[in-house]
Design a protein with these regions (language model features):
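Conserved short-loop catalytic and cofactor-binding motifs
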Residues: 8-12, 116, 163
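Short, solvent-exposed loop/turn segments at secondary-structure junctions
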Residues: 5-9, 42-43, 65-66, 88-90, ...
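Conserved, mostly hydrophobic/aromatic
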Residues: 1, 28, 83, 144, ...
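Catalytic pocket-lining loop regions of alpha/beta-barrel enzymes
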Residues: 15-141
Length: 190
């Protein structure tokens, strides 16, 4: 179905429960579609209401690093919630709180990730390894991209290296699920 983003840093963000979106979810529910959702801070209760109301929709949430524990609780409760780990663990959109909604340059990112690769990997594993291993069928690796330079081969190679290294540190019993099988299953079940 596509991604619905509710956390733009400019202007007023849309409400995931606006009638416009409810009609989309209803259509997705009738047709067993996947909706990737990028909630804003404070919208976790809204996400839970949507999970309850639309049980035939797979909600693929991502970039909610401030509510990791709560995501774990929702994963235990709702089979129709999946979570994609991507930009939030390799900082492709920036490593400062807000970089004026434009992120770092290609050169700044490459320098930052190379310099901090090991510490970022340790941080990512500390934040997510336990959650992934507790919910081995609902989390998946992603490679979220936005800015033009995100598609640069050198950047893509480094993001891939980070992802593979991260996956290599997970329990071998969950590595394939997280790397690709959960995504395959999510798509095949549709």
């Amino acid at each position: 179905y596509g991604e619905i983003r509710f956390d733009f840093n400019l202007g007023t963000n849309a409400n995931p429960e606006d009638q416009y979106f409810l009609e989309m979810y209803t259509l997705a529910d009738k047709n067993n579609l996947i909706v990737q959702i990028h909630p804003n801070k404070g919208q976790l209760p809204v996400l839970e209401r949507l999970l309850k109301k639309y049980p035939n929709v797979i909600f693929l949430a991502h970039v909610m690093p401030d509510v990791k524990k709560e995501i774990g609780k929702l994963l235990r409760t709702y089979d129709n919630l999946y979570y994609s780990l991507d930009a939030e663990i390799h900082y492709i959109y920036g490593y400062q709180t807000i970089q004026d909604n434009k992120g770092p340059t290609r050169e700044e990112y490459l320098k930052f990730i190379r310099k901090n690769f090991d510490s970022l990997l340790k941080e990512a594993l500390g934040n997510w390894k336990q959650i992934i291993e507790a919910h081995p069928n609902q989390l998946t690796w992603g490679s979220d991209r936005w800015y033009t330079w995100h598609f640069d081969p050198e950047v893509g190679g480094l993001v891939t290296e980070f992802g593979r290294t991260f996956i290599g540190h997970l329990d071998p019993a969950v590595q394939e699920n997280f790397a690709y099988k959960n995504a395959e299953r999510m798509l095949q079940d549709r």
